[in-house]
Amino acid sequence: LSDRVKLAAKLDATRISITPMDKRGKLSKKLEKTVNIQIHFTVAKNVTAAVGEKTFYCRITQPNEELLVKPGAGTFPFEGKQIPYSIRREIEYNGEDTPVTMYWPVEESLQSGTYRVKLFADGNLIGQASFTL
């Protein structure tokens, strides 16, 4: 029964959108003009999940399978290991649909190809998506 409660309390990221942005904050159609990558999602309503401050982690994997990570970035627990993250964001979760937006400031040369984004909270993978630059 406790496993069922844990499963029911798991958060879920829905409506995930990833937008490469230029310096004006508009959609960037060119790799070299991308200065930010915006990741937006909604944490779905869940009356079973604990309310309060939640930390969300985002991992962005490049086409060559390397993780985008800033120097000195931390790690978080997942499946018994500490794994590095690209972006971390804390929000107040009240059990209702909650929008979350994260930004990756582009300071490295980006490769053309498909990038994968994975979102985590409370030690669980809560959503994933991909985008192509």
Where are the language model's segments positioned?
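Membrane-proximal structural modules of membrane-associated proteins and complexes
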Residues: 1-133
